[in-house]
């Protein structure tokens, strides 16, 4: 029996995943096919074992062949539960819209966790679904530079820059306690609204930084209907501070806070959520014309408008408010006419 394994190799590729090269393995004895079958079965068994934790799920990320076998996004919506995709999708013109069904998403690698620190749940809860980094690798035109934006049915936005995804491993939830959305709990605020068709959670969230009294905050939207794959520099660059005070320490601190907090419900042009109904330049005008009004609005919106839906930030200290005020003021100039605090607010 002559065995030549000189061309049989385990190759470790650039993203730390092993691929077994069987096609170039020469086994020169009569039992060649059974050995190949055993090797292939072993590789399949190893690949099919579910990951035990987030890092293992990341290490089991798909090779090029696996990505090629990903479900093809559909041109038309087939069901209200389809996940809408847009932005910069691989192989498509920017802004193209496509859809993935729940069944499509369930064919992707699934991870499962029991979470105990998600404010959307009142008790430890089992969740399962697809990691956002998995979706980014498979669908984004430029996975290394794109960020994800989760858009909800009420125009709330949750933003996932590359650093956030790498640090916290957010998960697009497909099942809660083994149930599809029809069996999910209601929303945590009113206990009336459905939290489907999708929501986003984390295996465990530990803040990575703190700016004054604003910690790194978990982005846990529910009612997610759309994922956008966007160029991070373009999205965050749109709300970068402007003018001669842009580089000041306070303005830069306010910029980082606004990325995590304000951008979820307020917009500057096409960037940011539209749930609040108060665009960036309105906030800027308030900060410039009446810093006290602006501070009151940020800490306790209902003190200025009883119908306001925005949750308050009562824990913001004076330094945090000063940073946000300095940041938003960079968008105003004495020559611009902006609506002031006396303008009647939308609910």
Language model region names:
Residues 233-257:
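Electrostatic cytochrome c docking/interface patches
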Residues 37-43:
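Bacterial N-terminal signal peptides
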Residues 45-64, 68:
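Bacterial Sec-dependent signal peptides at the C-terminal "C-region" and cleavage site
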Residues 275-282, 299-331, 335-344:
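Axial heme c-ligation environment in periplasmic c-type cytochrome domains
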Residues 115-123, 244, 281-285:
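Second-shell loop/turn segments in exported
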Residues 255, 263, 267-297:
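Gly/Gly-Pro-rich "capping" loops immediately C-terminal to redox-active cysteine motifs
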């Amino acid at each position: 029996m002559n065995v030549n394994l000189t061309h049989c190799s385990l190759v470790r590729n650039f993203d730390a995943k092993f691929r077994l090269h069987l096609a170039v393995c020469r086994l020169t004895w009569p039992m060649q096919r059974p050995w190949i079958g055993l090797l292939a079965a072993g590789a399949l068994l190893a690949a099919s074992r579910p990951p035990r934790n987030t890092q293992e799920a990341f290490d089991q990320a798909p090779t090029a062949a696996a990505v090629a076998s990903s479900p093809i996004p559909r041109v038309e919506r087939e069901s209200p539960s389809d996940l809408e995709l847009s932005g910069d999708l691989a192989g498509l013109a920017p802004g193209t819209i496509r859809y993935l069904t729940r069944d499509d998403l369930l064919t992707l690698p699934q991870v499962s966790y029991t979470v105990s620190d998600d404010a959307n749940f009142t008790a430890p809860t089992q969740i399962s679904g697809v990691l956002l980094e998995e979706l980014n690798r498979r669908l984004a035109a430029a996975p290394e530079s794109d960020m994800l934006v989760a858009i909800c049915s009420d125009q709330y936005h949750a933003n996932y820059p590359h650093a956030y995804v790498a640090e916290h491993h957010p998960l697009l939830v497909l099942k809660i306690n083994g149930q599809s959305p029809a069996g999910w709990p209601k929303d945590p605020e009113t206990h009336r609204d459905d939290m489907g068709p999708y929501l986003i959670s984390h295996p465990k969230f530990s803040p990575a930084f703190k700016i004054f009294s604003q910690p790194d905050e978990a982005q846990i939207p529910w009612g997610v209907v759309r994922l956008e794959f966007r160029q991070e520099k373009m999205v965050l660059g749109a709300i970068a501070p402007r003018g001669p005070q842009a580089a000041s320490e306070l303005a830069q601190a306010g910029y980082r806070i606004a990325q995590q907090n304000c951008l979820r419900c307020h917009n500057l042009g096409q960037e940011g959520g539209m749930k609040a109904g108060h665009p960036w330049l309105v906030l800027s005008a308030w900060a410039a014309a009446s810093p006290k009004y602006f501070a009151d609005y940020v800490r306790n919106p209902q003190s200025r408008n009883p119908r306001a839906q925005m949750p308050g930030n009562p824990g913001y200290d004076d330094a945090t408010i000063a940073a946000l005020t300095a940041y938003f003021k960079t968008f105003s100039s004495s020559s611009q006419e902006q609506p002031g605090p006396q303008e009647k607010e939308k609910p």
